[in-house]
C-alpha cells in the first residue's frame, strides 16, 4: 500500500457516531455482531449510542501484516437465529471484500455496516461512512501508540 490514512480516536468516534445515527430507530435491532478485532471498536460505540446490550462476535482472521491478506480463517461464529435478522454486523473497514463475502454468507439477513470502505468492497456492505482509496492503508487508533519524538534541532 502506497498511501496511509491516519485515524485519531476523535475522528473514529465521530464517524462511528454518524454511523449510529443512520441505524436509528434503535428499537429495530436485537443486537450487534462485531467482526473481531476491528469491529469491536465501532461495536462499542454503536452499542452505547443505540442502547444495545446484546453483543456477539464473529472472529475472522485475514490480514497477516500491513500488506498481505491471507486465506480467511473463521475462528468463531456468533450463533444467531434467522441468518442474523434484526442484528447489525459491524466492522471497521471493508477492503477487498473477502471478509465481507464470508460475513454475508454467514448472516444474510443482518444489516452489515462499516466505518470505512474501499472501492473493491463497498458494494458488499449496507452502509458505511468514509470512502478510502483502494491503495491506502488505514492506521487505526488502536494500532497506534504515543511515543517521544525528538526535537528537529537534535536530529
Curated annotation (Swiss-Prot):
Give the UniProt record's GO annotations in the biological process aspect. GMP salvage; IMP salvage; purine ribonucleoside salvage; XMP salvage
Keyword field: Cell inner membrane, Cell membrane, Glycosyltransferase, Magnesium, Membrane, Metal-binding, Purine salvage, Transferase
Q: Give TM segment ranges.
A: none
Q: What is the recorded membrane topology of this protein?
A: Peripheral membrane protein
Q: In which pathway does it act?
A: Purine metabolism; GMP biosynthesis via salvage pathway; GMP from guanine: step 1/1; Purine metabolism; XMP biosynthesis via salvage pathway; XMP from xanthine: step 1/1
What cofactor does this chain's UniProt record say it requires?
Mg(2+)
Q: Which residues are listed for Mg(2+) binding in this entry?
A: 92
Q: Which residues bind guanine?
A: 95, 138
Which residues of the sequence carry a binding annotation for 5-phospho-alpha-D-ribose 1-diphosphate?
37-38, 91-99
Where in or outside the cell?
Answer: Cell inner membrane
Function statement: Acts on guanine, xanthine and to a lesser extent hypoxanthine.
For this entry, the protein name equals Xanthine-guanine phosphoribosyltransferase
Q: Which organism is it from?
A: Haemophilus influenzae (strain ATCC 51907 / DSM 11121 / KW20 / Rd)
Gene behind the chain: gpt1
Amino acid at each position: 500500500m502506497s498511501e496511509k490514512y491516519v485515524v485519531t480516536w476523535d475522528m473514529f468516534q465521530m464517524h462511528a457516531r454518524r454511523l449510529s445515527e443512520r441505524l436509528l430507530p434503535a428499537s429495530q435491532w436485537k443486537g450487534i455482531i462485531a467482526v473481531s478485532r476491528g469491529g469491536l471498536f465501532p461495536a462499542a460505540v454503536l452499542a452505547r449510542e443505540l442502547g444495545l446490550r446484546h453483543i456477539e462476535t464473529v472472529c475472522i482472521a485475514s490480514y497477516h501484516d500491513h500488506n498481505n491478506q491471507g486465506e480467511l480463517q473463521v475462528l468463531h461464529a456468533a450463533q444467531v437465529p434467522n441468518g442474523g435478522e434484526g442484528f447489525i454486523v459491524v466492522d471497521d473497514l471493508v477492503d477487498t471484500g473477502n471478509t465481507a463475502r464470508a460475513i454475508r454468507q454467514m448472516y444474510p439477513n443482518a444489516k452489515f455496516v462499516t466505518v470505512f470502505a474501499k472501492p473493491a468492497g463497498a458494494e458488499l456492505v449496507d452502509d458505511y461512512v468514509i470512502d478510502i482509496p483502494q491503495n491506502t492503508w488505514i492506521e487505526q487508533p488502536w494500532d497506534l501508540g504515543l511515543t517521544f519524538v525528538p526535537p528537529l534541532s537534535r536530529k
